[in-house]
Swiss-Prot record:
Protein name: Nodulation protein H
Gene3D superfamilies (alphabetical): P-loop containing nucleotide triphosphate hydrolases
SUPFAM superfamilies in alphabetical order: P-loop containing nucleoside triphosphate hydrolases (SSF52540)
Keywords from the named record: Nodulation, Plasmid, Transferase
Domain of life: Bacteria
Function noted in UniProt: Required for the formation of sulfated nod factor. Proposed to transfer activated sulfate (PAPS) to a N-acetylglucosamine of the nod factor.
Keyword Transferase (UniProt): yes
Organism ancestry: Bacteria, Pseudomonadati, Pseudomonadota, Alphaproteobacteria, Hyphomicrobiales
Organism for this UniProt entry: Rhizobium meliloti
Enzyme superclass (EC): transferase
Molecular function in Gene Ontology: transferase activity
UniProt-listed Enzyme Commission number(s): 2.8.2.-
Amino acid sequence: MTHSTLPPRPFAILAMRRTGTHYLEELVNEHPNVLSNGELLNTYDTNWPDKERLLLSDRELLERACWRYPPHSDKKVTHVGCKINEPQFQERPSFFAELTAWPGLKVILVIRRNTLESLRSFVQARQTRQWLQFKSDSSAPPPPVMLPFATCEAYFKAADDFHARVVNAFDSSRIRLIEYERLLRDPVPCVATVLDFLGAPALQLADRGILRRQETRPLDQTVRNFHELRVHFANGPYARFFELAND
């Protein structure tokens, strides 16, 4: 990897789990000057061969991410980043403050409009132990799942709280919101928006990604107790998550 004279500009992709951050990272990394290095706080992320890094202080860990990141290619890196999801901040609560204080760091907050889809996807992936789906994989879709009322409510609240926390912690010039649904529908212009926000040179990406969406069926076919949940959350702040296209 070739380093430019100036240190790369740092960024972080923040999100709840199962919001398309792997896909976004795959597309962003098509740019010859941008490198996103996976989940910094994930012990098992293969982008980071040294698990001992998690023993570092918060500041040392961010220095590792921004200045001493692992080489992946011969890219001339001008923008370097990583991903962090909401549960990882729970496991390392002091890290959020260090992130907000890091000079020049920009944040891409990825939001899935329907948080129930995010939870359903997480439970499916956990049960099947299949966290990614490749375009070459023709396996059957994952089985439907049961979602307890309390689990849904806690997850919905956690998502609302996390999104508000991130938005309130960063100046508007340092944060950009990306919707999962738009990323799937229009990946090329969506990534162009991200690159422009980071200040990376414009580039027409080819969307040669190898990942694909694991589940495309509607919620009433993938959540066994969907209708019971719909009744339970009717007329409340989360009723919108249970709307179907044919309603």
